[in-house]
Amino acid sequence: MSLPPVFGKELNMSQQLIDNFDRKFEYLRLSITDVCNFKCNYCLPDGYQRTHEKQFLSKQEITNLVNAFAELGAKKVRITGGEPALRKDFPKIIEAIATIPGIQKVATTTNGYNLSSHAQAWFDAGLDSINVSVDSLDAKTFHLITGKNIFQKVMQGVNASVKAGFKQVKINSVLMKGLNDIDIDLYINWIKDQPIQLRFIELMQTEDNGEFFNKHHLSGEWIKQNLLENGWTQKQSLSHDGPAQIFYHPDYLGEIGLIMPYSKDFCKSCNRLRVSSVGRLHLCLFGEEGVDLRDLLGTSADKEKLKQRIVESLKSKKVSHYLADGESGGTPHLASIGG
């Protein structure tokens, strides 16, 4: 059986993003900056501290990178940070990625600080889907978690995103015991009449948040059981869902997604690769230090070498992370490679 053509060509097995465990990777998470203007207590409680002097990937380097991934079968790109909207050329980056043959969906994750005034422009540039980090629906708790007293402004941005016409608007909320766990009913009531997918994400341990993790980690399993006991039904997973478990209710316009990295077989459905803002390929959020791609990003003439390096790197991808053993790999914090 022949494989689906890409740009009129046929992909052979050696040119596909498939690892040794038959997982297929059609989703690229691309960080364009590790700078963030929030001080979230689970990620950058002391604010952004630059740890390198490297320049972030240029728009041309990004274009060359995504072109290579697209020719290897990638169909979706999520632009991440840090806070990606801090880059002045963010709309141009969206447009550049959206026009690459083979890329079917362009998404981003943002803290929403300037979303209310930019949502329409990003949509017009070619952005299809947007995730907004809203870690509490209580303004005071939001301020406590993020270090920013702009809850209403962020929520205005969420509304602006819906009005702009995005195919999908998602809300990300990191679950934290003793901080925002009391907000769960507020969240669920809120999406009753909102066409939004609410995503509860388990707090994950990184190199620098061990004490915070031990104090505030909360398993998503109890939320899952609560949902099932209250009329919610788990959707059959689609390939683009990745490890997320999605739930729907006939009386609710919105959906709920659970991302539980400590659950059994979480990595079995992994469908994504990550590239950092300085051009390092990361096979896992909690994996190794990464494979440098930048020396091959300066010119499109190196595209075949770039594709080969990416494919070869996949051979070393492990079957799973080792978070349950307290090993967070080389990830200092979630902003470092885009979460």
Swiss-Prot record:
This is GTP 3',8-cyclase. S-adenosyl-L-methionine binds at residues 42, 82, 133, 204. The keyword Iron applies. It is an enzyme of class 4 (lyase). It comes from Psychromonas ingrahamii (strain DSM 17664 / CCUG 51855 / 37). Residues 20-241 form the Radical SAM core domain. The gene is moaA. GTP binds at residues 29, 78, 109, 170, 272-274. It catalyses: GTP + AH2 + S-adenosyl-L-methionine = (8S)-3',8-cyclo-7,8-dihydroguanosine 5'-triphosphate + 5'-deoxyadenosine + L-methionine + A + H(+).
